[in-house]
C-alpha cells in the first residue's frame, strides 16, 4: 500500500538510452546479461537508510531543510519511515538496503531500551522484507553520533564505553542475522584521535584489536554466515582515524590475526580523502585478498571533506568495476549508495532521481568494464609487460632459488644490461576512453 510520500509515481522501468524521462532508467536493465550474469546480480544495488531517510539536509552553517513526516523520535515515526523506505526500495527496484541501528529505532534512555526498540523495529522489518522481497545487504551499529562516543567506542579511555559499544554491536549482529543480512560492517568514525597529547596509541590499537576479535568470535559462536567488513576512512569526524585506508587496515588485521576473518567495504569518497583513487583501493584490496563490498558515491574534488554525492563519472565507474570483475565480482558484498541529496533537493522525487542517475552510471561503468575484460584490452598489455617473469630463471629468482650472491654472479657472467621499455600509459588511457 502506498504511503503517498512519492505521490502517484510508478515503479521505475528501463526505457533505453534515448529516453528523456527523468524517472526511468536509460542504462540499467536488471535483466541484461553481462559476462554470463544478470546485471542486477553483478551490481547488487543497495540503498543506504541513513542518507536517504535520516539525514535532515543540514550543514555546519544551517539546519534542517528536508521536511519528512517521520522526523520524530518515536516508534510510530520509525515505522512510518520504514513504510516509506520499503516503498522506495520497491519503486526503485533495489534488491538490498543497509542500516545503522540508530537509523531505524528511536533512541532509548539506556542500553536495554535501545535493544527493545531495535528488536521491535526488526520485527517490523522482517514483515516488510517478506512482503517486498527486498533483502538486507548489511547492518551496522552507530558508534559515533551519541556524545558517549565522543572519545571513541572501542578505543575510548573509559572501559564502560567499550562495554556499551560491544554490547550494542552484539545486538546489531543479532538483528543483522535475524534479517538475513549478508554482511556486518564496522566503521570507526571516532576510532582515532584529535591530538596525540591525550592519546595512548598502542593502548587504543590493542583495544580496537580486542574489540574486533570479540566480533569475530561472536560471529562464529552464533553461526552467522555473513562477512565481517571494515570500512576505511582517513579522517572526519576524527582528525586521524585508525582505519585510514586499505593498506593501513590490512596491516592492522595482520597484527591482530584477523586477515583471514575480515574483509573491506571500500568507499569512493573515503579513497579520495586518503589521497588515493577509488580503483587504487579496490585493486589493492584484491591484491591483498580482502575485498568485500563497496560504498558508492563521489566527492567534490574541490572540497576537503566527504560530500557523499551520487556517482556521475562513467570512466571512474568503469575502472572501479573493472577491478571488481577482475577480482571475481561480489561474493556477499554489493554496491551500496552511500550518497545523499544536496540540501536544496527537497522534493521526494529528487531521492528517486539521484538513485536512478547513480544506478545508470554504475550500469554504464559495468558494461564498459565487462567489454574491456572480454577484449583483454588491459589484461593483454599487462601480461606482455610482465612476460619476462614467466621465464624459468626469473621464476627461480622470485621463488627463492637464487641467493643475492648468485644473482650478482649471473649479472656479471651474462653482462646483464637491461634497457627500459615504454610503459605506454597514454595508449592505455586512450584504450579506456574508447570503451566509455
Swiss-Prot record:
Keyword Isomerase included in the entry's annotation: yes
SUPFAM superfamilies listed in its UniProt record: Xylose isomerase-like (SSF51658)
Annotated EC: 5.3.1.5
Key words, A-Z: Carbohydrate metabolism, Cytoplasm, Isomerase, Magnesium, Metal-binding, Xylose metabolism
A GO BP annotation: D-xylose metabolic process
InterPro entries: Xyl_isomerase-like_sf (IPR036237), Xyl_isomerase-like_TIM-brl (IPR013022), Xylose_isom_bac (IPR013452), Xylose_isomerase (IPR001998)
Compartments reported by the entry: Cytoplasm
Subunit: Homotetramer.
Protein name, per record: Xylose isomerase
Organism: Sinorhizobium medicae (strain WSM419) (Ensifer medicae)
Name of the gene: xylA
